[in-house]
């Protein structure tokens, strides 16, 4: 059935292959490392000569393919007939297309098998002939990564230890400050206790003194009592019964009551003194306690201030050390920069001196070349004068030449100031065996002039170098009738 003029697109899971034309099949495999081009007509593998399979990575492409669009180009005469045939015979068309698809799939499978065999062979050849480009550094990479991990862990551990050391130093500073505060407080308490002991000793001494005074007073009272009784007894014994005087007087004073009163007075005095002393002692103790509490509070405040000041001092010392290190680094950088720029300046100075020397040499060379150019211009003018002179001489001597066909040569020479050497040669050409009359027109004559230029370089009156250059020059003179 005729299927011209229709366009059919069929989806498949295999790569496309055109059965009627040349189509390149590109296969990609995840475990292969090369691309292989296979033509469907000849089934030949195209690889460059002298090159193996290169280990360049292959681009991965999904194994799902779309068969390309097949266009069947109809003839202009059969367009309507083809469209009618397709519309009327769809089943036959689909059957034909399915048969073609089956044959196409069989060819694709065959080509895939051949391509796989060729890839295996190429892989074997490449594995046999492929040189080792570079050693395997994977083990070293793993070792390097492990060492880098260890280095990072060590750095983290070092930073943690440094932070712990700093914290320990701060805690030690706090404990040292607390110890010093407690030590100063203990010293103050010991000083207060020593003062109180001294006060207690003074009070015990005053108490003992008062007790001694009371005892001495009681002893004195007893002595007075005994003396009084003795005096009374002695007076009674002296008087006896001789005098009996009745005296109406005031009743006698009871010494016991008086002594009792005195004792009560002294005891009250002692009690008042004791109370006064106790009150004074209590007031002193309260004042001392208040002073101790206030001093302890002030000391704690001072200790806190001291701790804060020490922390501030430590932070300032750290900052000062950092500033010192920064200053040292900046000084080193400045010194390096100065040294680098000094070296660069020296290089630039040397380059400037070299350029100045080159400029001076170029100027001297230009002056020398200018002088040589002037000399050469002078030589050129003289040579032109000489050439004109020789030309005039040749023209004047032309009438004197013989008429027979023979070759004559005339070589005049001239030397001017040992710098130029000219050798003109006059030649006239004639053929042997042919005689011409004198008045016949002959061939043109050629004059050979040799220009010898001697260049001498003179310095301080001495010839340094000398160069000689010989340049031939031909002058053509037309023949005269």
UniProtKB/Swiss-Prot annotation:
SUPFAM superfamilies the record matches: Intermediate filament protein, coiled coil region
Region described as Head: 1-90
Subunit structure: Heterotetramer of two type I and two type II keratins.
Pfam families: Filament
Gene3D superfamilies assigned to the protein according to its UniProt record, in alphabetical order: 1.20.5.170, Single helix bin (1.20.5.500), Vasodilator-stimulated phosphoprotein (1.20.5.1160)
Protein's UniProt name: Keratin, type I cytoskeletal 39
Chain intervals for the UniProt region annotation (Linker 1): 126-136
UniProt organism field: Rattus norvegicus (Rat)
Domain IF rod stretches: 90-401
């Amino acid at each position: 059935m005729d299927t011209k003029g229709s366009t059919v697109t069929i989806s498949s899971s295999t790569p496309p292959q055109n059965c009627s034309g040349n189509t390149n099949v590109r296969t990609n495999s995840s475990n292969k490392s090369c691309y292989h081009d296979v033509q469907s007509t000849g089934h030949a593998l195209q690889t460059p000569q002298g090159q193996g399979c290169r280990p360049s990575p292959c681009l991965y492409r999904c194994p799902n393919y779309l068969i390309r669009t097949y266009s069947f180009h109809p003839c202009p005469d059969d367009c309507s007939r083809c469209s009618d045939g397709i519309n009327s015979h769809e089943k036959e068309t689909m059957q034909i297309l399915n048969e073609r698809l089956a044959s196409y799939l069989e060819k694709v499978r065959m080509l895939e098998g051949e391509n796989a065999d060729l890839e295996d062979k190429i892989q074997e050849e490449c594995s046999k002939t492929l040189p080792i480009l570079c050693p395997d550094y994977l083990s070293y990479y793993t070792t390097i990564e492990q060492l880098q991990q260890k280095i990072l862990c060590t750095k983290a551990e070092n930073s943690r230890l440094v932070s712990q050391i700093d914290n320990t130093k701060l805690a030690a500073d706090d404990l040292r400050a607390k110890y010093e505060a407690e030590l100063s407080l203990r010293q103050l308490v010991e000083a207060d206790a020593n003062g109180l002991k001294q006060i207690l000793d003074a009070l015990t001494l005053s108490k003992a003194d008062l007790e001694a005074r009371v005892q001495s007073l009681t002893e004195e009272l007893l002595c007075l009592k005994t003396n009084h009784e003795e005096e009374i007894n002695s007076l009674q014994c002296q008087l006896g019964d001789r005098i009996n005087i009745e005296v109406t007087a005031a009743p006698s004073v009871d010494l016991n009551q008086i002594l009792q009163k005195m004792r009560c007075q002294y005891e009250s005095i002692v009690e008042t003194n004791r109370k006064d002393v106790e009150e004074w002692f209590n007031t002193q103790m309260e004042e001392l306690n208040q002073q101790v509490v206030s001093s302890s509070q002030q000391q704690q405040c001072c200790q806190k201030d001291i701790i804060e000041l020490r922390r501030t001092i430590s932070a300032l010392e750290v900052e000062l050390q950092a500033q010192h290190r920064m200053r040292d680094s900046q000084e080193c950088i400045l010194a390096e920069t100065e040294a680098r720029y000094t070296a660069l300046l020296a290089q630039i100075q040397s380059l400037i001196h070299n350029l100045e020397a080159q400029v001076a040499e170029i100027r001297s060379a230009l002056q020398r070349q200018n002088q040589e150019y002037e000399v050469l211009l002078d030589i050129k003018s003289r040579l032109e004068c000489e050439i004109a002179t020789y030309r005039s001489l040749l023209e004047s001597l032309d009438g004197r030449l013989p008429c027979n066909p023979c070759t004559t040569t005339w070589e005049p020479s001239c030397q001017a100031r040992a710098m130029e050497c000219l050798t003109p040669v006059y030649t006239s050409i004639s053929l042997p065996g042919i005689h011409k009359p004198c008045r016949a027109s002959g061939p043109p004559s050629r004059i050979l002039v040799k220009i010898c230029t001697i260049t001498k370089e003179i310095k301080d009156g001495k010839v340094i170098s000398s160069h000689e250059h010989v340049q031939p020059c031909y002058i053509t003179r037309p023949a005269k009738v």
